[in-house]
Amino acid sequence: MHHYKGSEWNKWDLHIHTPESGMANQFGNDWDKYVLSLFKSVIANNIAVIGITDYFTIDGYKKLLTDYLSNDQKMKSLFTPAEISAIKNIAIFPNIEFRLKTIVNGSRINYHIIFSNEVAIEDIEENFLHEIEFVYEGLPFDTPNKRKLKRRNIEEHGRSIKEQQGEFKGSDFTVGCTTAVIDEQQITEILSKHKDKFEGKYIVAIPVDEDLSKISWRGQDHMVRKYFYQVANMFFATNRGTIDF
């Protein structure tokens, strides 16, 4: 006689930003404090899967894996043996957040690609991120100046914006991330181009409450909303009504 387990539910949190995101956060650049807080909270809340999120890069995910999870001495200096054992059972995925060129009520749509942790960091960077282009700050009437989506290019873009528009504050990277936009068609084409590396190893997620819910089904952007509902594999939602729907 065989016993088959029925449906099993786990808590997932796939949208956790790191200090590398360039956002204001309570940790600043104190990565030890961030990692301590992250995993103690995840363990306390019995979360099984997390998505380590950054804008346009996987720098935070890479740092977490190389400087902490792969560093036994560092982990032992921060956590108890029981905590380390619990951390090893947590699935950790890289989540890249893009700001798209599509505008909804004055705001850009955010678009997430969450990769399997089986995909090598080098493949995500070299065969995906660094093949994406964004429009770099240029001069009026010039041909659009495009740059590869690399951290130094984002920083240069942010620095140029700050020099021209004094109201932009924050680091060069923060301003670059705030103003850089991506065409989602590029993302789709590049992922399709490298099917041998990525097929079946990523999902598309969109924060429906922040973005898509602002688009009226009865307005001129009806097809925009419909398109993103069709391409998304999952939605981020905190609104009770959205979840029930």
Regions of interest found by a model, annotated:
Residues M1-V35, K40, D67-S70, K74, ...:
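Domain-core and long-helix interface of multi-subunit machines
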Residues H15, D54, I92, I113:
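Divalent metal-coordination and catalytic microenvironments
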Residues H17, D54-G60, E97, D209, ...:
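An acidic- and aromatic-residue-enriched active-site/binding cleft used to recognize and process polar
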Residues F39-I58:
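Divalent metal-dependent hydrolysis catalytic cores, especially in the metallo-beta-lactamase
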Residues I50-I52, I92-N95, I203-P207, F236:
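A structural signal for short, well-ordered beta-strand segments and their strand-loop junctions
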Residues T57, S85-I92, E97:
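Extended, helix-rich scaffolding/adaptor regions
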Residues S70-I90:
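Short mixed-charge
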Residues E97-P144:
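Internal, well-ordered alpha/beta segment that forms a basic, Gly-enriched binding/recognition surface
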